[in-house]
Amino acid sequence: MKKRLPTLLASLIGSALYSQQALADLADQCLLGVPAYTKPLVSGDANSLPVHIQADKAAANYPEHALFSGNVYIEQGNSTLTADEVQLTQRQEQNNAPLRTATATGNVNYSSNEIKLQGPKAWSNLNTKDTDVYQGNYQIVGRQGRGDADTMKQRGDNRYTVLENGSFTSCLPGDDSWSVVGSEVIHDREEQVAEIWNARFKIGKVPVFYSPYLQIPVGDKRRSGFLIPNAKYGSNNGFEFSAPYYLNLAPNYDATIMPNYMSKRGTQIQTEFRYHTTPGEGLVEFDWLPKDRVYSSEHASDGDSDRWLLYWRHNGVMDQVWRFNVDYTKVSDSNYFDDLDSKYGSTTDGYATQKFSFGYADENWDTALSYKQFQVFDTNSSDAYRTAPQLDVTYYKNDVGPFDFKVFSQAAKFTNVNNSYPEATRLHIEPTLNLPLANRWGSLNTEAKLMATHYQQENIDEYNENTGTGRHLKGSVNRVLPQFKTDGKMVFERDMDYAPDYTQTLEPRLQYLYVPYRNQNDIGVYDSTILQTDYSGLFRDRTYSGLDRISSANQLAGGVTTRIYDDQRAERFNASVGQIYYFSRPRTGDITGTWDNYDNTGSVVWAGDSYWRISNQWGIRGGLQYDSRLNSVALGDAVLEYRRDENRILQLNYHYASPQYIEQMLSDISHTGYQQGISQVGVTGSWQLVDRWSLVGAYYYDTKANQPADQLVGLQYNTCCWAINVGYERKITGWNSTDSSSQYDNKVSFNIELRGLSSNYGLGTDKMLASGILPYQRAF
């Protein structure tokens, strides 16, 4: 580990020296004391630009010697030099151009659009622009960074800056909280790298670290090196310390390797590889924790205590028509995200997606060949289906007379992780004819389609005998369903009488949908789940996702939306309310279906959404769904948020799901924590108390279970050259199977950051809010 410390420190200091992004994010107060170049920039060859000299006195012996004294001011291009005295000399050298030099003494100040130098004496070769400043100090223009040196040298036509016994800190003048010093520092602007010999890192005036040699990245070029380390303590993992190392492998790909030490479990190695190539861009992450001591003791029967995660995301487009996408996550065991932190999954995830797709699209065709399966984390679930593979082909032809024509077709092969479950091959074709009519105040779309599906089901005998679902699957099934739909919308607009320059709209919508009934009890459920019915869902064609369940429909969906726009055409308010009126009850014939056992007709489902931007700081958003079949409010949510600025946020929210709704939607979930419904109130926020202190917190309480779901509090102290934050989080990670009680993880985090060492000069509260099990989401 000691061998790695020089590289760690080098990368931290290098980021502070020349982080352009950090400059863009600097708080205004951090620019106090930082010099700024306010004059117009002068372009062109500096050697060809005129030199302007002012002085109280001048004496010359042309062309060998000239002496300027008293308030000497010299300007050339973007550079100026002031001193008590400046002596110019010119000496003819054999077979060479005359050597011209300048020596400045007394209160020497050199400034340009890049740097300011001060010292008692300076020397410059006017031919080569080589310059030396003695016993001086420097300050970077326009960003934090300053220091001093016995000698400061400019070499190689300003390519190299050499400091002898030099120092650097990003702290403002008068604050020397930290600094790095070296016997020699060479900064190469072209290669954007700096080398430091005999480097000492100081906290105040006390040296705390020494390295004989450091090489640090500077400028915008990516350089390999350690990033900012992190430390925290939790009841699940014990003390944790991570030190990410960045690898700049090539201009189009790089990697980050992060050893993450956990005192209770061991050392995890997290490797993230990023690439950008002609076939596309993507990211691959592989995390490896060998011999997890906690997992080994809690799951001794498993035998294998190695924990790992593999994640691959790829998005690629070639020749504007070919596309290849990957969304793949796989972990070693179902408890991985409960035990270990990862940005690619959380404790609330019930499964991990593993999908590959390859497609082609042009003006009339859209095709995709995909493979998809799920790694389900519920140990009681053993019926997860995979599509291996699935082919989707869609043909579009618009403006066929007054009609738009489309044909969607699909071929899919379904297999199950459980060998005792059925497998199926599904073929589907769906031609659609649409008549769109529209003008500036309304639209009417009338659509007719035919849905024809063939199933070839295998391995069904054991399922029919033992499943207990009441379904009786058949080997070969054909299902043909026509569908008719007409959807009308209108938009009325008026100027508001009591609010000048404000505009209100009224947008009624009416949709009739008809699908005849077909008994589908002989078809397995391979990729269909019931869909949530919010306001926009009232006008959905389908009650179920996928193709295995297509519910009958003889219904009229109606709704109305009103919006209010201010004088800048920004939406300040909207409210929507609607319902579905069933002329006959929707059915699929599946006796285990969610809604087949209800015979309600009439106004069955109501839904509403609303949003009110009360002011630039206050906003309200909410939604409500009522289902008469359950005789209760099915779902509800409300959010009230005050946002003064990015560092001052306060949000109050509430989420509700009735027990009846949970029972219908998640009938296979047996845990009592779900069966009693969801009623959860939460408050979250971050607040900059004063310029240097900020507080962040979140608290979510489940009123059904009478217990907190997530608790988070953090405090950060921030200055222009260093920051510190301390955080505490207590979150649910699972349930105790013996007594159904909740299991919690208590975690304390502690971070110190040298300001200027990262690209973010904000207070960091957004990251803390996003780290909770229930991350903060903006209301407006």
Curated annotation (Swiss-Prot):
Family: Belongs to the LptD family.
GO terms, biological process: Gram-negative-bacterium-type cell outer membrane assembly; lipopolysaccharide transport
Keywords: Cell outer membrane, Membrane, Signal
Major subcellular site: membrane
Protein name, per record: LPS-assembly protein LptD
GO cellular component: cell outer membrane; transporter complex
Signal peptide (residue range): 1-24
Classification lineage: Bacteria, Pseudomonadati, Pseudomonadota, Gammaproteobacteria, Enterobacterales
Subunit and partners: Component of the lipopolysaccharide transport and assembly complex. Interacts with LptE and LptA.
Function per UniProt: Together with LptE, is involved in the assembly of lipopolysaccharide (LPS) at the surface of the outer membrane.
InterPro entries: LipoPS_assembly_LptD (IPR020889), LptD (IPR050218), LptD_C (IPR007543), OstA-like_N (IPR005653)
Annotated compartments: Cell outer membrane
